[in-house]
From Swiss-Prot:
Enzyme class, broadest EC rank: transferase
Cytoplasmic side: 113-115, 223-229, 301-306, 411-417, 489-496, 595-965
Pathway the protein acts in: Phospholipid metabolism; phosphatidylcholine biosynthesis
Annotated GO MF terms: phosphatidylethanolamine N-methyltransferase activity
Protein name, per record: Phosphatidylethanolamine N-methyltransferase
Main location: endoplasmic reticulum
Family that this chain belongs to: Belongs to the class VI-like SAM-binding methyltransferase superfamily. CHO2 family.
Record GO biological process: methylation; phosphatidylcholine biosynthetic process
GO CC terms: cortical endoplasmic reticulum; endoplasmic reticulum membrane; perinuclear endoplasmic reticulum
Entry's EC annotation: 2.1.1.17
Record carries keyword Cell wall biogenesis/degradation: no
Length: 965
């Protein structure tokens, strides 16, 4: 949130304060002794204090721009349990439901309690993650909760005569005003704020019952393990209480920072006009309320000494992470991190990341390789696996060989030792061997010089290095997994000893390492993952995002957690030593390879302390801080002495390689809104389909007619008089409809493929979001956006009925992004009974035929022709949105293209059918403008020209002259 919008209020209130203070000061100097002036002074001072207090008030803004004072509210525990807080009917209902939980835990038979409370807790957990998640999702996307409140007139004053339920209005008014005695009037508050307050009461019930049912389930399952000693019992309870206390502190500190506004997802309804400051626990871990904020679950599991409680805690925690990923993160991205405005001028097109140009330095007659597109064929991830690439083939084959050998060899001590030594060798090569190569590359560009020596380019050196590093990384971890498999023994009894707990903790550590690696890759991108700044002079600035916001070197702490997890699961000395060696080698790599290079490249731009370090330093008492500073001073002096002695002065602080390539976490709008099939409406009597009609208008395709190609019989070559309309791929289509004046306000028009429906009377398939209602305000979703005109009287041409007309536009996600033959269907009354069908029309992508155009695709003229043909298609694919679609060939695409993969998929589909070139969607993201895409298309067509079937681009057989007779 930005504070700029709040500045006018602050400026106005501050001016009131400034105007009153001089008056009070002058009065006290001139007539200080009089009681009258003292009273004036006190009155003016109180006014100044009141103004100052108004300055501190929080202001909110609704989506329509309404600004209001956000009153102070209290958390649910205080509202429910503090006797000093006023109570109302909803509080009594919540407390009564909680009391029922306690009564059930006390009176039910012992054998019923455990499964019953497990089911009760899972019910409330689903109500939280699924129920609240669904409500928040539809509110974020469609403002549907506010729409429902408006439709049901929940907050409409009964005095207007428009509220059908005055009793409900009075109940809500009493409920909400009782809780907020200051700065709040039910009648004057925006509907978004009142809706949020009502939503809060539902959340209070779910959250309280969720927590209470979990605690009662833990109490029901609690027991003392057989044979547990006093020391172990004390340690278990001490650790559990510590985790619960830590959990309590996390929740309280998080609430201190975000207040009720973020605690109850207020930004789904309105925004507050002030800067967001995240300190305290928010510097300790990402999403602390969902990550370390659930530490208490595991503390309670320890105190209960129950695996049932532990497993249900893990399930609940996983469900909470799913809630975060599916519900909260998309809304956070949309609200606080919108795509950057599109760059209007592409002045840097030829210079941006020029070091990558050599990767595509192939011979060309254009000589324009200064504007070469970026490489896009990434290595990391299963989605990038390519069996036409030698690195991927080698990794798959070697891992397959390793897996086969692991499975077929016996688990004798000889083979176990052999596999452990094999894994150790790969670990040494991965950390020490590659570390030496990177050190020499940093100091004297050794790796690059080797390829330049044989006439290769810097890009070739970079590609080969990525392959070596990727292969080494995969084989290092695969060999460790194979060694762990050889040393693992399946437990004969999972309930004996610590067998089950070791597996749970071990798998958690492995998951932690996987998450850490994923976060690092998302932050650094492919360039940083493969240490690109060792090969190229990077001009990027260090930015600390994602996991690097909290840790300078996440690999130091969490990067080897999976090794210790495997050691815990296998419970093997050899694997433990392997984990120890791997951790030590990782620390050595960071200290002796990465840190010196980072110091040399980024220098003073390196950050001193990460978020966790800052938090710990601020939390220490002053004596400890002074002692720590003195120790640091002694260590620094000793370190400098040693560094000077060995002539290897290096910085004390270490940071991770933080060269950032843009975050490609795109939000995929994969599942559009859909309509549910319904029965034929019974109120069709009196509606004649002949009074309904649809007509279309759109951008027609300009090109040759290919329907008569000379391959038909002579009679079939005659073109028909009535031509089917053909519109451009992705171009908006305007639909004009006609209907009787008394038509249903819930009528709607949908777009379908002609072959999707067998019946002409009833539509048989869902519209999948490709529909627009005829009248606004009749449906809850955002379908009204396509309505242009509705219910305009039509000049009367027949005496039997009065007609009205309207107009709507289908664009963006309401279109089919494929070629084919389509039709619009007019439906009656919110159902699927068809009243009218438009004439069929085609969606076409005109082919770019350089042969008939007489254009040399390998020349600059050819590139310009491709640009001219490609630009309107790209604009259609990007919805013709000025914030996304370029106006010329040099302008970059908008930031939405990186966020939402649908745009890139539209573009590559169009290029495939227009030019016959199949690109990956990542190519569109890397090129970023039409000019680079045109260059890539021309280059691809030039390379593929010898394999083309056309005469101008080459022949399939080397025929240079006619056959001799």
């Amino acid at each position: 949130m930005s504070s700029s919008a709040a500045d006018p209020f602050a400026a106005r209130l501050n001016s009131d304060v400034r105007q009153r203070h001089p008056t009070a000061s002058a009065t006290s100097k001139n007539v200080e002794g009089t009681s009258q002036q003292k009273q004036q002074q006190q009155q003016q001072q109180s006014e100044a204090n009141a103004a100052a207090s108004r300055v501190k008030k929080t202001y909110g803004k609704t989506p329509d721009g309404t600004v209001f004072v956000v009153p102070t509210t209290h958390d649910m525990v205080t509202q429910l349990l503090d006797p000093r807080e006023p109570k109302n009917l909803s509080d009594v209902a919540v407390l009564a439901i909680i009391a029922l939980h306690f009564l059930a835990a006390y009176y039910l038979p012992w054998g019923v309690k455990r499964p019953l409370f497990a089911a009760i807790f899972m019910f409330w957990r689903l109500a939280y993650n699924v129920g609240i998640g669904y409500l928040l999702t539809i509110q974020s996307k469609y403002k549907l909760l506010v729409t429902w409140a408006k439709r049901w007139k929940l907050f409409e004053n009964p005095a207007t005569g428009k509220n059908p339920r005055p009793w409900l209005y009075n109940l809500l008014k009493k409920e909400l005003e009782t809780k907020i005695p200051q700065d709040y009037k039910f009648e004057e508050a925006p509907i978004e704020y009142n809706t949020w307050l009502t939503f809060r009461r539902v959340v209070d019930l779910i959250l309280m019952c969720d927590f209470i049912s979990y605690c009662l389930f833990a109490i029901v399952c609690a027991h003392k393990p057989d044979g547990e000693g006093l020391f172990m019992c004390f340690a278990r309870w001490a650790a559990g209480i510590t985790l619960v206390g830590f959990n309590l502190w996390v929740k309280l500190d998080a609430h201190r920072v975000v207040k009720d506004y973020a605690w109850y997802w207020g930004d789904f309804f309105y925004l507050i006009e002030q800067e967001l400051t995240f300190d305290g626990v928010f510097e300790l871990a990402p999403h602390p309320m969902y990550s370390i904020g659930y530490a208490g679950y595991y503390g309670i599991s320890m105190m209960a000494a129950s695996y049932d409680v532990l497993f249900i805690s893990i399930i609940a925690h996983a469900a909470q992470f799913a809630f975060l990923v599916i519900v909260e993160n998309p809304h956070i991205e949309k609200t606080y991190n919108p795509p950057q405005p599109r760059v209007r001028c592409e002045s840097e097109a030829g210079s941006q990341l020029q070091e990558f140009a050599s990767e595509y330095s192939v011979p060309s007659t254009t000589g324009r390789h200064d504007n070469t597109p970026l490489p896009v064929h990434n290595l990391i991830g299963l989605k990038n696996l390519d069996f036409f690439r030698i690195t991927d083939v080698a990794i798959v084959l070697l891992c397959a060989y390793l897996a086969v050998v692991t499975m077929v060899t016996p688990n004798t001590r000889f083979y176990q030792a052999l596999f452990v030594l094999h894994a150790l060798a790969w670990r040494l090569w991965y950390s020490a061997g590659l570390g030496v190569i990177l050190t020499m590359q940093s100091e004297e560009k050794m790796f690059t010089r080797h390829f330049l020596k044989y006439g290769e380019s810097v890009g070739e050196a970079w590609r080969q290095w990525k392959g070596i590093y990727h292969l080494s990384n995969c084989l290092c971890h695969a060999s460790f997994i194979a060694a762990s498999y050889k040393m693992y023994e399946f437990p004969a009894d999972w309930t004996y000893g610590w067998a089950l707990l070791k597996h749970v903790v071990g798998l958690s550590l492995i998951a932690l390492q996987v998450w850490t690696a994923t976060s690092i890759y998302e932050s650094l991108g492919e360039f940083g993952w493969f240490y690109g700044d060792f090969f190229f002079d990077s001009k990027r600035q260090l930015t600390y995002t994602s996991i690097y916001r909290f840790l300078n070197n996440p690999e130091r702490v969490f990067g080897t957690a999976g090794l210790w997890g495997a050691a815990l699961i296998t419970w093997s000395r050899a694997i433990f030593l392997m984990a120890l060696a791997g951790h030590f080698l990782t620390l050595a790599f960071l200290a002796y390879v990465e840190k010196p290079h980072m110091q040399k490249v980024y220098g003073r731009n390196l950050r001193d302390d990460a978020g966790v370090t800052k938090f710990i330093k601020r939390s220490l008492p002053p004596p400890v801080t002074e002692w720590q500073q003195s120790i640091d001073k002694v260590l620094d002096e000793t370190k400098h002495f040693i560094d000077e002695f060995v002539d290897a002065a290096r910085s004390r602080l270490a940071t991770g390689s933080s060269t950032i390539v843009k975050d490609t976490s795109a939000l995929f709008n994969k599942y559009p809104a859909r309509l549910t099939l319904s029965k034929i409406s019974p109120d069709l009597a009196g509606y004649d389909p002949k009074h309904y009609g649809l007509s279309l208008a759109g951008t027609r395709v300009v090109g040759t007619n290919e329907k008569a190609t000379g391959k038909e019989s002579p009679n079939a070559r005659v073109l028909k008089d009535v031509k089917t309309q053909a519109f451009e791929y992705g171009a908006p289509i305007r639909v004009k409809w006609t209907a009787p004046a008394n038509h249903s306000k819930k009528d709607w028009v949908g777009l379908y493929m002609v072959t999707d429906n067998r019946s002409r009377e009833v539509t048989e398939v869902p519209s999948l979001g490709r529909w627009v209602p005829t009248n606004p305000g009749e449906y809850d979703t955002t379908t009204d956006q396509g309505i242009l005109v509705w219910d305009q009287p039509v000049e009367k041409k027949s005496e039997d009925t009065d007609l009205v007309e309207g107009e709507m536009v289908f664009e963006g996600d309401k279109l089919w992004w494929t070629q084919g033959v389509f039709e619009f269907r007019y439906h009656h009354g919110g159902g699927h009974h068809v009243m009218s069908i438009s004439e069929p029309f085609e969606i076409q992508i005109p082919k770019f035929d350089d042969e008939h155009m007489g254009v040399d695709i390998s020349g600059e003229v050819g590139e310009r022709a491709v640009e001219a043909a490609l630009l309107p298609v790209i604009r259609n694919c990007l919805d013709r949105d000025p914030d996304i679609a370029p106006s010329n060939a040099e302008e970059r695409f908008g930031g939405h293209v990186e966020r939402d993969g649908k745009y890139a998929r539209r573009v590559v589909y169009a290029i495939r059918h227009m030019f016959g070139i199949d690109f990956a969607p990542a190519v569109v993201l890397a090129d970023g403008n039409v000019r680079r895409l045109a260059w890539r298309i021309c280059h691809a067509k030039e390379v593929l020209a010898p394999f083309s079937m056309s005469h101008t681009n080459g022949r399939t057989t080397p025929v240079d002259s006619k056959f001799s007779e």
